[in-house]
Amino acid sequence: MVTWIASTAPAALVSLVSLAALTLTGHGGPPPLEWGEGPLTVDSLPRVTYVAHRGGAREVPENSMSGLMAAYRRGTAQVLDFDTRVLRDGTPVVFHDETLNRTTFLGGEVRGLDSEEWKGVRLRPRDRLPGSWRSERPPTVEEVLDRLGGRIVLMLELKDPGGLDRVAGMLRARGLTRSVFVNTNDPAVAERVHRAGLLTQLWRSADQMRGDRPERWRSWVDLLDVDIRARDDDLRRAVRSGVPRVWAHTVVTPAQRDRALALGCDGVLTDAPGRLARYRGRVPGPVSAVTGR
């Protein structure tokens, strides 16, 4: 069941915003870049990689096409991250929560809608975001891949693992199997991602990391996504696991970034890529200077 959520904005303003959103192309735009020998792949990533988590959710509307495009144009991250859910008819869409309530003008479960009904969903940008943002429809995964695939490395999280086969088909059809990390918190799902021939990312919480033995995953995980709140020893164990890339989430401050790099991580997922770009700094020597330990 889908319900309407009352907006705190004046009704006339909401109507104008909705009308403007309907008259804009939203997910149109130029055709894909000429790739030459092929799309941009993970082989192009720098030694230390910055990921715009949910597009950079403290700076742009999360999981929106306009937010992803803004993060792409700003160039403060080398990877753009977004979340995926599956609609009732199997269509993968870009969305984080199980329900529509927090970030749209509607309520109810995402999986309760089909692709036609999805066209009526409108995001509700947070008031405290910098800049001015219009209300727009959340994109489908296909739309993001067609707009940004091959232009920049992407990272998508499978919130609904049942959508893996369809997502895998989209990536193969577009030649993007080396250009998109496919993320999950479940090692069993990560194994399926690997068997599908995709770049496999496995994220872990601080609590999970206390009991993890990440060296067991090194033969089939391409990216281990670790929690910045984890203990130093747990982060070091991840770094020494043999997994090719170890990146830390969700980093917001320069001090958190510096701690992650000092402990050996070679990338960070951040909600504020612009902020971190302004404070590149140096990796501190003793970790205790950053963590207080």
Named regions from a protein language model:
Residues 2-11, 20-293:
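Phosphate-group recognition and catalysis centered on beta-loop-alpha active-site segments
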